[in-house]
Every structure is written in structure tokens, then in C-alpha cells.
């Protein structure tokens, strides 16, 4: 078959019938185009007859150049129902049906929360599906939160295969995109979180041709570890226009985004779009049976556009997270110093004998919270991971009782905390033996068993009532003020017990977990909950809109931490990002101060054998914590990250790393020399720069000719420079 005849007779050519061009002479006159403006952004819309098309999202006041991308298909919502004729012949989700034929009904604007909300309503005359698209703006930030709701107004069930949370259009020229677009995304993995890379679209599989691509650049996650492979955010930078679009998918389960192109005239693509959303049928087995009268809501997604590049996008998202995501909590601005006994310390084997000297050392260093990590509930001869679930103190670890040890924490002026993994029951636990399958995620008639753990199903109110009693007991009996909530397993597809599909069961469970957290914090508003998923395995802003602190990583090599924390600063607020400082018992002052520098521009997660390190190394820890409390932490809740050396690579042991933080009237840069040259040069104009910490190890700094040079006398050193 001739290729051109084949292309002309398939869905590519048919897209014009599904998605007519906005403003085409062939279409009857429709409603007038309109714009929705916030102080920082402009969304523009047009019509193809009575079908609404999203034209573009641009910074307020931005004038598109005459040769900028023109908008073609621009569907405002992409949705596909089972049995419908898909406009796309492949795996793309950029249009869908009835998404392409939705008829615009009306728009409504209202005051909402900290800003304004626009609601756009569509309907489909064939399926009787009604779709509501929500745009929620927040004062002072160039970001809008988007989500979609589908309502079945008909008499028959509808199968939802995908429903976009948001669509972005006109990101680039439909045919020249590979020369002007950079896609920024972050790979994420255990002990190597938040590794940012910039790709041309073709490097991710979205390749230019003279027509519409059948492929897409995409990323996603399947299961309850929302960040197991990638962070749920990305950016598209148009280097020709000097604009960057960005998004953050705010969901603690499966999600997906794609970037590709569509055509509205003939077969030549003229629009580069981004589809953004949560779980769907193709990628996460989340088919939804929408019954008559029922509704289905997508997950929320934050979107925005700025003039500039990656750093400007990070600044916008950082401001948005503070304005719209952080739950009010007294510790948000205090940035308390946390000691945790796990990393390079007791490693899940706590006892009264070991804890008492650690508690003394942590208090002497200046820590304000003291957290006993895993193992406090297991007998000395027990595998603590296979029996979790009862959350009762082990009598042989605490001969005078756990309360005796935690009372010592309080006597020394610290708040006690405990590690929990509340969402699971160990395979050999009493809880798993006693409770029915309805307490657990189930697939194909069997409980989901991962990493010696069964996964509790938070849709079951008996589960949440049980865990409420656990938390109540810990707070009332032990005065626990901090819960490290860990999660060391991924559910993958989810549960098909009492669900339309495994992915829908997981979505309902994910939302029930969030509701449980909200209820918990309403009862205990000063309780700090740390979000941990074997480190950064669930580092998303569904969880971080409820929890106060994010565990950055389980990485044990302190030399790799600067690359992880620098990348993570683009994804998590510095006042929520807890980074380890964990000197070994044999650490010298260089090693101890390197550890401290890594944590001092975010939240200090102190660990290590503070009871055994040398006096000189202990002095570096104590001095670092004192400087943090007296000088640095008051700036962190207003600081914006920047990257004088770009994004680092956790596998590169030669190249130095630098992370900056700017707050009103204050700028600091953390700089780490690894194995490379003794002088690190940064492109910063800072004639009055000085070393804040450590100030007694021979590190020098000089600002001259628009460059800042930091000289390290030895390899593997770090410092904080105030500029």
C-alpha cells in the first residue's frame, strides 16, 4: 500500500472531521472568542461552531510573535468513552471522543478561597455526558489549579477510559518543535531521587515528520508509589519564544502526561499539546463505569507559564506551593531541627541502652525533635518488617517501658516522635491473620502481598478507625508529637475488590488515605507528620498538602546527597524538605561539616552517631545547628531556589554542586567540592561574599568580575556562602 494513500485514509486525515479548526469558514458562526485573565496569566479560548477550543496559556501581557505557533485542535478537555471512535489511531490521548465533539454550554466565574475560579461547562448530545472544567487561580502566583468533572446525565452507563485534568496547547510549532522545545523532567528512584534532565522531544520518542506524529513524549507512574520512576511534574521550554510551561500533578497514586502534536487542517500537524492527568485505563488499569446520575472527578493538576526557563518555572511553583498547597501548621515557619535515630545510626535496632546516650547527644547538639525509627515495636529476635501492624512497644527493647525513654526526650526539651508504617500489615502479623480480606487491597481474589507486607484498604472505615486508635494511643500515652509515616511498598495497579477496575479501586483508596490524614490533623493540629516512601518514593503534593515534612532519600553515602537535595528543591518546598546530616562515628570535621551544609538550606534531619564522634566533629555539628537556628531558618519559608551550576548528576563524583536560596534581603549558596578541582567558580556577582559555615576549616571565597570563586583546601568539603 502506498504510504500517502494509507495516511490519507486513516485516522490522521480523519482528525479534521473530529476536530474542526477554530474559526474555519466551513463552520457556522459560533460564540465570540474570550480570554480569562489572572494578574499573572491569560487563557485564551476560541470556538469551532459551538465547540470550545483552548487556544493558549501565556504570561499576562505577553505578545506572541507573528511567527509563533498557531492553535489548531485545542480541545479544552480530552475524554474518551468505551465504544466511541477514537480520533487517534495509536496510543495518544490528546483528543478522545466525545472530547472532540463536546458542545460548549456556559462559563461561570466566582471568588474561591485565595483567588478566583472559572468553570466551563460542556455537554455531549450523543452520550448525554456533561463535563465541567475548573480553573482555580491564586493571588500573586502565575499558576492555576485545574481539574475536570464528568457527569452522566443520560440513561445508560458510560465507560470512561481517560479524562484529562488539563490540556495545554500551542507549546511549539507543529513541525519544528524539535529545534525549539526542551522537555525538563526528573527521574526518581530509590536513593537517587530528583535527577533532572533536559531532552529534545525526539529523545523521548516524539519525532518530527511532515504530518501528525503517532508517538508522544510521556511519563507516568503506576501504583501507590507516585514517584517511583519520575516526579509528577515537568516543564516544556520554548527557547525561541523564551517561555516555559510547567505542571505539577497533585496525586498520591497513578498519573500520566504526554506531549505530542495534532492537525486540524489536512494532515499537517499545527499544534503541540500536553495532556495532563491521573490514572486512566491504558496506563494504569483505571477504567471507570459511570452510572446514570453519577459523576467522576479527575485529579488536580497545577499549570502555569512564565517568561524564562527552568529556574523561573521552579520559582513560580515554589510560590504556588506556599500559597495553595501547604496546610497551616505552627512548624511551617519554625523549621524545627529533627533528630532521627535510623540513618548511619541505630538502623532499625533501637533499645533503651542505645537510645539514652543518643538522646543526650542530640539534645546537646541543639535538636528539637527526637524520633525513634523502625523496630521499636518488634522483639529483639523478630524481623520487624514482617510483623508490623499492632504498634505496641516491645518489652525486651524497653525494660523500663518506652514511656521511660520518651520521658527522657521531653526532660531534655525535645518533642518525642515514632516511626510508623500505618498503611500495611506484615505478612506474619497478628493483624493480617485476624482481619478479613475487606481490610486489604485484593487483586484476582488474592491479597496483594509486596515486600512481606499486605496493603490496607483505606476505603474500609474499619481500617481507618483502627489506625485512629493507634494514633490516639501514641499521642495520649507517650506524648508523641511527630510521626514518621513510612511506606515501603508499591501497590502497582491497585485493587479490584468492590471496584470497577484495579486502578479505580486504587484511586478511591488514595483519596480515602488523604481524607484520613486530614481528619488526623484536625484532631491533632500540632502533630508533625513526615511523608516518607522509602525516602522520596511518594514525593507528591497530594501528600505534601497534608503532611508537614518530606523525607528526601534513603541514600547512605553523604557525597551523593548534594545532587539529590538540589534536584529535590525544584519539587518540594525547602521548609518541607528534610535532608540527612548523618556523620559516622569516625567522621572528621570536614566530613561532619559537609553533612551539615547539605541540610542547612532546607530542614535538618540530623542522625549519625553523635554519641561517639570526636569533639572536633561534634563541634561542627553543634555550630552548624546553632547557625541554622539563629541565622538561616528564619529565611527558609520565603526562600526561592536557584542553580548557579545547573542541575547535578548523582552519578558524577567529580563535578561540584551548588544550590542557592534567595529570600528578601538574604541570599545564600551551598557549595560542595567532590573529587574535582580545588576552586569552584560560580557565575555570581558577589563582591561582599563571605563564608558563613564552616568558618574555621580554611575555605576561602573571592568575588570578582561577576564570578564567585570558592577555594577548598581539601576534596570532599562543603560550605555555605552568604552573598
Question: How should these model regions be labeled?
Answer:
Residues 288-307, 716-722:
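Short Pro-Gly-centered flexible turn/kink motifs
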Residues 5-25:
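N-terminal export signals
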Residues 702-723:
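C-terminal beta-strand-rich structural cap/linker in extracellular carbohydrate-active enzymes
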Residues 83, 87-88, 94, 98-99, ...:
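Glycine-rich, aromatic-flanked loop segments that form ligand/cofactor-binding clefts
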Residues 30-268, 284, 696-701:
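Polysaccharide-binding surfaces and accessory modules of carbohydrate-active proteins
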Residues 648-687, 716:
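Carbohydrate-binding surface patches
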Residues 442-586, 612:
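Active-site neighborhood of glycoside hydrolase catalytic domains
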Residues 332-466, 482:
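Aromatic-lined carbohydrate-binding/catalytic grooves of carbohydrate-active enzymes
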Amino acid at each position: 500500500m502506498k504510504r500517502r494513500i494509507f495516511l490519507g485514509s486513516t485516522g490522521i486525515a480523519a482528525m479534521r472531521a473530529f476536530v474542526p479548526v477554530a474559526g474555519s469558514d466551513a463552520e457556522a458562526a459560533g460564540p465570540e472568542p474570550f480570554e480569562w485573565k489572572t494578574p499573572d496569566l491569560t487563557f485564551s479560548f476560541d470556538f469551532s461552531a459551538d465547540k470550545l477550543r483552548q487556544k493558549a496559556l501565556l504570561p499576562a501581557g505577553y505578545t506572541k510573535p507573528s511567527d509563533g505557533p498557531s492553535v489548531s485542535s485545542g480541545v479544552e478537555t480530552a475524554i474518551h468513552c468505551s465504544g466511541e471512535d477514537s480520533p487517534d489511531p495509536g496510543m495518544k490521548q490528546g483528543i478522545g471522543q466525545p472530547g472532540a465533539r463536546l458542545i460548549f454550554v456556559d462559563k461561570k466565574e466566582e471568588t474561591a478561597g485565595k483567588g478566583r475560579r472559572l468553570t466551563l461547562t460542556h455537554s455531549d448530545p450523543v452520550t448525554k455526558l456533561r463535563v465541567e472544567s475548573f480553573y482555580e487561580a491564586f493571588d500573586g502566583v502565575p499558576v492555576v489549579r485545574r481539574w475536570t468533572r464528568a457527569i452522566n446525565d443520560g440513561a445508560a452507563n458510560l465507560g470512561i477510559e481517560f479524562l484529562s485534568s488539563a490540556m495545554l496547547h500551542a507549546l511549539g510549532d507543529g513541525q519544528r518543535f524539535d529545534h525549539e522545545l526542551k522537555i525538563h523532567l526528573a527521574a526518581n528512584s530509590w536513593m537517587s531521587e530528583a535527577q533532572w534532565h533536559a531532552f529534545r522531544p525526539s529523545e523521548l520518542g516524539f519525532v518530527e515528520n511532515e504530518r501528525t506524529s503517532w508517538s508522544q513524549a510521556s511519563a507516568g507512574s503506576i501504583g501507590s508509589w507516585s514517584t517511583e520512576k519520575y516526579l509528577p511534574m515537568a516543564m516544556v521550554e520554548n527557547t525561541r519564544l523564551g517561555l516555559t510551561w510547567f505542571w505539577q500533578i497533585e496525586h498520591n497514586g497513578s498519573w500520566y502526561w504526554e506531549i505530542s502534536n495534532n492537525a486540524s487542517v489536512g494532515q499537517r500537524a499545527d499544534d503541540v499539546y500536553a495532556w495532563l492527568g491521573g490514572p486512566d485505563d491504558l496506563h494504569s488499569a483505571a477504567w471507570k463505569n459511570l452510572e446514570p446520575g453519577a459523576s467522576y472527578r479527575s485529579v488536580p493538576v497545577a499549570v502555569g507559564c512564565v517568561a524564562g526557563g527552568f529556574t523561573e518555572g521552579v520559582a513560580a511553583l515554589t510560590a504556588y506551593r506556599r500559597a495553595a498547597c501547604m496546610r497551616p501548621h505552627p512548624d511551617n515557619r519554625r523549621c524545627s531541627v529533627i533528630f532521627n535515630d535510623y540513618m548511619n545510626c541505630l538502623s532499625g535496632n533501637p533499645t533503651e541502652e542505645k537510645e539514652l546516650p543518643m538522646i543526650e547527644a542530640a539534645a546537646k547538639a541543639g535538636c528539637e525533635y527526637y524520633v525513634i525509627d523502625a523496630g521499636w515495636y518488634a522483639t529483639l529476635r523478630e524481623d520487624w518488617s514482617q510483623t508490623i501492624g499492632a504498634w505496641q512497644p516491645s518489652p525486651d527493647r524497653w525494660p523500663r517501658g518506652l514511656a521511660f525513654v520518651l520521658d527522657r526526650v521531653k526532660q531534655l526539651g525535645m518533642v518525642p516522635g515514632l516511626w510508623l508504617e500505618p498503611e500495611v500489615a506484615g505478612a506474619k502479623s497478628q493483624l493480617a491473620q485476624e482481619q478479613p480480606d475487606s481490610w486489604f487491597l485484593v487483586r484476582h481474589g488474592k491479597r496483594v502481598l509486596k515486600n512481606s507486607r499486605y496493603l490496607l484498604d483505606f476505603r474500609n472505615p474499619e481500617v481507618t478507625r483502627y489506625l485512629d486508635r493507634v494514633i490516639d494511643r501514641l499521642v495520649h500515652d507517650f506524648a508523641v508529637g511527630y510521626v514518621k509515616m513510612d511506606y515501603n511498598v508499591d501497590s502497582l495497579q491497585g485493587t479490584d475488590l468492590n471496584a470497577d477496575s484495579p486502578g479505580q479501586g486504587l484511586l478511591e483508596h488514595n483519596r480515602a488515605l488523604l481524607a484520613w490524614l486530614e481528619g488526623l490533623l484536625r484532631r491533632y493540629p500540632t502533630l508533625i507528620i513526615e511523608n516518607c516512601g522509602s525516602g522520596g518514593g511518594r514525593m507528591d503534593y497530594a501528600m505534601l498538602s497534608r503532611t508537614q515534612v518530606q523525607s528526601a532519600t534513603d541514600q547512605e553515602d553523604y557525597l551523593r546527597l548534594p545532587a539529590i537535595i538540589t534536584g529535590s528543591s525544584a519539587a518540594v518546598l525547602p521548609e518541607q524538605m528534610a535532608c540527612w546530616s548523618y556523620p559516622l562515628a569516625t567522621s572528621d570535621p570536614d566530613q561532619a561539616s559537609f553533612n551539615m551544609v547539605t541540610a542547612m538550606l532546607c530542614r535538618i534531619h540530623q542522625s549519625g552517631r553523635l554519641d561517639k564522634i570526636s569533639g572536633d566533629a561534634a563541634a561542627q555539628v553543634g555550630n552548624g545547628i546553632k547557625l541554622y537556628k539563629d541565622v538561616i531558618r528564619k529565611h527558609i519559608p520565603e526562600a526561592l531556589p536557584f542553580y548557579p551550576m545547573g542541575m547535578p548528576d548523582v552519578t558524577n563524583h567529580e563535578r561540584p554542586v551548588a544550590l542557592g536560596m534567595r529570600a528578601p534581603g538574604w541570599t545564600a549558596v551551598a557549595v560542595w567540592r567532590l573529587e574535582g578541582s580545588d576552586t569552584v567558580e560560580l557565575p555570581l556577582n558577589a563582591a561582599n561574599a563571605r563564608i558563613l559555615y564552616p568558618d574555621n576549616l580554611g575555605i576561602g571565597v573571592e568575588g570578582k568580575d561577576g564570578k564567585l570563586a570558592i577555594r577548598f583546601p581539601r576534596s570532599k568539603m562543603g560550605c555555605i556562602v552568604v552573598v
